[in-house]
């Protein structure tokens, strides 16, 4: 059917139920191959490592300052490329990634080993759910 793709986004119309599903099939698989990221051995269910909640505490603690080793320019550039690629995907069809991408993007200019680990966890998450999309 004509008009079922736009800017790399696949649009599947369900007129009978008045719904529309947008997705980007194959985008995540291509991204994982491009950045040579292996499939996770067990599913990653969250896009970002969160601080544990202290139930009953008067206040929640903020994360401690990242004092891990700084990355070289090549590894920092790789993080920037991954964040850019996933930002396009997240804004188009998978907005659950935006909070994690925002946190990583804020630290990518002075990327550390901890930032690289956060990107690795995010790639594990998208590898767990490669065919995600939005239904309107």
PLM regions with names:
Residues 1-136:
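Long, low-complexity, charge-biased intrinsically disordered regions
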């Amino acid at each position: 059917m004509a008009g079922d793709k736009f800017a790399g986004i696949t649009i599947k119309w369900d007129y009978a139920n008045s719904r529309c599903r947008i997705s980007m099939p194959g985008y995540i698989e291509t991204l994982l191959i491009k950045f040579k990221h292996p499939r996770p051995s067990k599913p990653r269910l969250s896009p970002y490592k969160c601080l544990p909640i202290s139930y009953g505490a008067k206040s929640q603690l903020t994360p401690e300052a990242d004092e891990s080793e700084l990355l070289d320019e090549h590894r920092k550039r790789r993080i920037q490329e991954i964040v850019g690629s996933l930002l396009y995907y997240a804004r188009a069809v998978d907005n659950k990634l935006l909070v994690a991408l925002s946190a990583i993007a804020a630290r990518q200019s002075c990327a550390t080993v901890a930032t690289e680990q956060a990107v690795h966890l995010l790639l594990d998450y998208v590898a767990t759910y490669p065919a995600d999309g939005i239904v309107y």
